[in-house]
Amino acid sequence: NIRETFNQALDNLSRDNTLNELGKGFNARQRVRGNLDASNINLQIGFKTIRPNSSASKNGMPIYSNVSRREIFDLYEKYSGQRPDFRNIPNKGQLSSTTITSGPWKGTTIILRNFSTSREQTGAKWTIEFRNQPASIRGQRLELKFR
């Protein structure tokens, strides 16, 4: 169906633009006293701009406060194109992952999880992680953490 193909192409373009903006934010991180400062990586959910907690976002990963579970799931869908489909990871928690199959972010896996090895330090309840991001994006690990 031509309409479905067109709508899918628009969705993919929107996703790619959103991910490209996020990538620009990660690339713009500056070193402050030896650490990457991620306090300027803002997120857009609908008409709402979410800013990271500036004092907590000094280790290279932005940490956001006061973001609802629904908003986190909406962000995951915005980045991946799919609603979370969780599977239980024994002794850890829940995890949902999607791999992008087209466009400049092809091969990038987006993971939503409610566990983290840094939970004690960050207080994060949810993490959106990006693996195998395009080579143009600086950094080994790209994560968004939510308290």
Feature map (PLM): residue ranges:
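Catalytic toxin/effector domains delivered as secreted proteins or via bacterial secretion systems
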Residues: 2-147
